[in-house]
Curated annotation (Swiss-Prot):
Gene name in the database record: ISU1
Biological processes per GO annotation: iron-sulfur cluster assembly
Cofactor(s) required for function per UniProt: [2Fe-2S] cluster
The keyword Protein transport is assigned to this record: no
Family statement: Belongs to the NifU family.
Protein name in the entry: Iron sulfur cluster assembly protein 1, mitochondrial
Lineage of source species: Eukaryota, Fungi, Dikarya, Ascomycota, Saccharomycotina
Length: 179
């Protein structure tokens, strides 16, 4: 005679989920999957640094706006540059996206503040990803941050070239003749 307890153990469906209430669910849903962010990502996501905006019309402010169509992340980064030294004296960001995108933006603002614009454009996404321990599936977030700083510097430089027009040879010659 076979005991009832043996039959319960012999039934593979009962062994698959002994501690979980048995409900009709797909096998792939039986074990919850959990993605954990690194503590640095959680810190920058929970307490983002330098969130806000600067006046985009100021000539010493450069604005970079970039996005990733694949995931929907949008990042705006603004830098305020000291005109005499070329040093980034303030930086602000607003990011609409996942925790990794927000953390990448926040970390980048800390990284570029106090650097020259030449130093800032040399920052690579790999440095951001390494510092935040981003998984490969989230590398695009650090790429957005790299693109944002390059775009902000480009905008700043374009404003500077408009602010300080240079005299062409004809204008300089006409000015000499007029005096």
């Amino acid at each position: 005679m076979i005991s009832r307890s043996f039959l319960r153990l012999a039934n593979p469906a009962r062994r698959a989920m002994p501690a979980v209430k048995r409900v009709n669910m797909m096998p792939s849903m039986a074990l919850p999957t959990k993605r954990l962010y690194h503590e640095k990502v959680l810190d920058h996501y929970s307490n983002p640094r330098n969130v806000g905006t600067l006046n985009k019309l100021d000539v010493d402010v450069g604005t970079g706006l970039v996005g990733a169509p694949a995931c929907g992340d949008v990042m705006r980064l603004q830098i305020q540059v000291d005109d005499e030294t070329g040093v980034i004296k303030d930086v602000k960001f607003k990011t609409f996206g996942c925790g990794s995108a927000i953390a990448s933006s926040s970390y980048l603002t800390e990284l570029v503040k106090g650097k020259t614009i030449e130093e800032a454009v040399k920052i690579k996404n790999t440095a951001i990803a390494k510092e935040l321990s981003l998984p490969p599936v989230k590398l695009h977030c650090s790429m957005l941050a790299e693109d944002a700083i390059k775009s902000a510097v480009k905008d700043y430089r374009s404003k500077r070239s408009v602010k300080q027009p240079t005299l062409g040879p004809e204008a300089a010659q006409a000015e000499t003749i007029a005096t």
